[in-house]
Structures are given as C-alpha cells and as structure tokens.
C-alpha cells in the first residue's frame, strides 16, 4: 500500500528498487554488477549463479451484487464464488504449463466480503504469475487472465484485473561465475561445497539488471528456515556474512587486475538481451 501511494503521487514508477535505479540512470555508467543472497542451501553450499523465475504482479477485483445471504441470496451475485471458481480454473490450466517453464501461481484473497450475512459483492485477490522466461511469463499470464475472467463470467460477476510490472528472470553469465569460483576455492571452499549454477523459482529485481549488463548473483548458505518466513534466521555468521564478502571482494580484484583485462574480456563477449531504452519500453 505504501509503494502504491508513492507511485500514485509520482515519486516512483516501478515497485522494484533496481527497476527504479535502471530508470533513473544509476546503471548508465556501470559495466557490471554483483550481489549475493543467503538462504538455506543445505549443508552450507554455495550456488555460483542460479537462474530464477520472473513474475508479473496481479491485483484482481471481483464485482458482484449484495443481497441478504439468509433471506434472499438469489438476488445477489456472489463475488467470492467468482474468485473461488477463478482459482480452480487456473488449477485446471496447470497441466498446460511445461515443466521447463517452472510456472507458479499463488494467489491470496485479501478481501473476501464485508459482513457474513451479506452476499459478497467486493472481493479482492492478489497474486504473482511466475515463469522461467519472458515468453513463458506472457503465455502463463494470458492463461491465468482467461481463467480469472471465466470465474467471474460463470456467476455473472464483473472483474477488474490490474497488472503490475514484476521482475525479469535472472540470466547466468558464465564468464563472471568462473572468476567467482576461483575465489570460492581460494577462501577454502571445495568442490563439495560449490554447486555450479543453481535453480531458484523465486524472483529478484536483480534479474532486470542481468538483461542489460553482465551480472553475478551467487547464493550462500549460513541460514536456516524458508525465505520471508518467521523461521528464517542466521545460523552461521561467518558463512553468511564474511565468506560472501571475501569471495566477492576478491572477484572485484581479479576483474580489475592488469588494467581490468578480465572485465574487458567479459564485456567484449557480452551481448545484452535489451538496451536500457528497450527495457523501459518493455516494462
């Protein structure tokens, strides 16, 4: 709600921090970027450069008609039933999602009605539609929209779908990962500790940056619990804080050593998926 208000007032255009940084030119004079996440990788593993899903945000309003739920429910149009049907319609689409596309749809009902003895006429839903590529995001999103509209149509309700720019999938850049791996070994990690690449079906705004410049986004262990939950906690401060900082600092040294030869080679071989201008037009 806070970011929505900022957008309404014109302070921001996108909800993602790095999307705003791209728009405002923060990366215009940046050749490459790196960051890391910590998560429960199991036995303190390091994922050198996991790919991720992108997503499209979605706010949905089902509009029905109020009536007394006890004495005359037949005079109303139940917007909650429309929402429930819509969710089940998406479930019926799941067999059409290819495994390689890693599609995810996980809605929540943020408003299910107003009072228990009135047929719900205003029901709100929020969700992300996630997938592995831009094309599969667009395809899954079209199927989800169709399913949502069918739920409303089935009970005679109306529907309003507001789509919000989400994040793009993270792209791997092998040349940068090779530099990182050398430094992971230098700080004492072994082959048993390092997982090449990685597969993550969550989403990061860093994925947007990876479409424009070479990026590196390793994931380190040192935590327990699922991301964004109450159970998430730092389990090993050395591994969660110091190891990533050391590995990435050493990677910067290697990239800039010898008049930045390594960095220049990476840039020469890099072909951006989008220019900044193309990215902003797409968003």
Where are each of the predicted segments found?
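Histidine/acidic-residue-rich, glycine-tolerant segments that coordinate divalent metal ions
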Residues: 1-106, 113-118
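Metal-dependent amide/peptide-bond hydrolase catalytic core
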Residues: 84-283
């Amino acid at each position: 709600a806070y970011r929505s208000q900022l957008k309404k007032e014109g302070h921001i255009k996108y909800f993602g921090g790095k999307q705003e940084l791209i728009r405002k030119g923060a990366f215009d004079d940046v050749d490459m970027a790196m960051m890391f996440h910590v998560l429960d990788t199991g036995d303190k593993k390091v994922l050198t450069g996991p790919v991720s899903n992108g997503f499209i945000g979605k706010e949905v309003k089902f509009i029905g008609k109020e009536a007394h739920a006890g004495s005359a429910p037949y005079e109303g149009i139940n917007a909650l039933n429309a929402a429930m049907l819509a969710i089940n319609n998406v479930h019926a689409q799941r067999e059409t999602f290819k495994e390689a596309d890693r599609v995810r749809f996980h809605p929540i009902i943020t408003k299910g009605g107003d009072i228990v003895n009135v047929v719900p006429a205003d029901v709100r839903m929020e969700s992300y539609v996630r997938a592995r590529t831009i094309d599969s995001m667009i395809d899954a999103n079209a199927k989800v929209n169709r399913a949502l509209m069918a739920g409303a149509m089935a009970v005679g309700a109306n529907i309003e779908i507001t789509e919000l720019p989400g994040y793009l999938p993270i792209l791997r850049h092998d040349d940068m990962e090779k530099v990182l791996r050398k430094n992971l070994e230098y700080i004492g990690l072994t082959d048993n500790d390092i997982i090449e690449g990685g597969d993550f079906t969550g989403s990061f705004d860093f994925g947007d940056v990876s479409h424009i410049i070479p990026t590196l986004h390793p994931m380190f262990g040192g935590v327990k619990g699922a991301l964004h939950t109450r159970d998430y906690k730092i389990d090993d401060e050395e591994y969660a804080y110091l190891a990533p900082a050391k590995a990435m600092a050493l990677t910067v040294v290697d990239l800039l050593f010898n008049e930045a030869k390594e960095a220049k080679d990476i840039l020469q071989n890099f072909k951006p998926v989008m220019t900044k201008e193309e990215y902003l037009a797409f968003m």
